[in-house]
Amino acid sequence: TNRAIHLNDGEICILKDNNVKVLDEKGKEAIKEERAVDWSIEDAEKSGYQHFMLKEIHEQPSAIYNALMGRISEIEPRINLEDLESNMDEITIVACGTSFYAGMAGKYIIEKLAGTPVFIELASEYRYFGRKSGTVIAITQSGETADVIGAVKEAKKYGCHTIAITNVAGSSITRIADIPIYTRCGPEIGVAATKTFTAQIAVLFLIALKLGMKNLCISNGDLQKYVSSLRRLPSYLEEVLGRENEIMDVAGKLKDCESVFFIGRGIN
């Protein structure tokens, strides 16, 4: 089936042969709306790949295309993104795991392109150390990460505007945050994240561009160049994935190393 009922905290679902009943915290029947889930059986198959992670690495070009689709326009330089809070003078990003690394990249991009100060906190630490003002951007692939949900609830208690970047429509985070922004990658089964990580960075880049235009940090000409580059991004990814054999050779040389140093600067 592609039909689902989403449960809220404290609700109980009773499944019988021909009946589904949902009870609220007080034991009273709750009227729930069925929603269509955008997925196909092919999403849960390896489609000839050795494992799901390899499949999802190769799905990155289409994932980036879907994340950008309808959100960028070259005809008239514009970022068509969900309505963002007009006053985003200060941003805190909360996330866990791979999404936290996407947030680190997002901090660099937003500060560079929009001039907006960005703070980043592990979601599990936000309630203790995080800033309780401005806009909070929560990043979670599943939309169900407990620490991220807890951080958003904490932020809302202090009146923060909240944005959720997630991959799953109807997930818990989308019902809590003020604005959900979907990465639209399709199911990701492999761990650690692959296509959802790159799509999260793409969405953060769009946020940076929109803020950069609002803050007068980016000209129309600059935006045109960025949008043109974003449109070519799926083909760039295809080009890199076409060098898989070379990459496998390098991986083969590294696989038995006891330690590896990654050295970079800036966003790297």
Predicted region positions:
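Residue-level marker of alpha-helix boundaries and capping positions
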Residues: 97, 142, 241, 265-266
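N-terminal segments that mediate ammonia production and transfer
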Residues: 1-86, 99, 108, 112-113, ...
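Glycine-rich phosphate-binding loops that contact phosphosugars or nucleotide phosphates
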Residues: 86-232
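Structured helix-beta-strand junction loops
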Residues: 60, 87, 176, 256-257
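Acidic catalytic cores of enzymes that act on phosphate-bearing nucleotides/polynucleotides
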Residues: 115, 255-268
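Bateman (tandem CBS) regulatory domains
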Residues: 133-136, 254-258
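Generic hydrophobic alpha-helical scaffold/packing signal
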Residues: 54, 149-152, 208, 238, ...
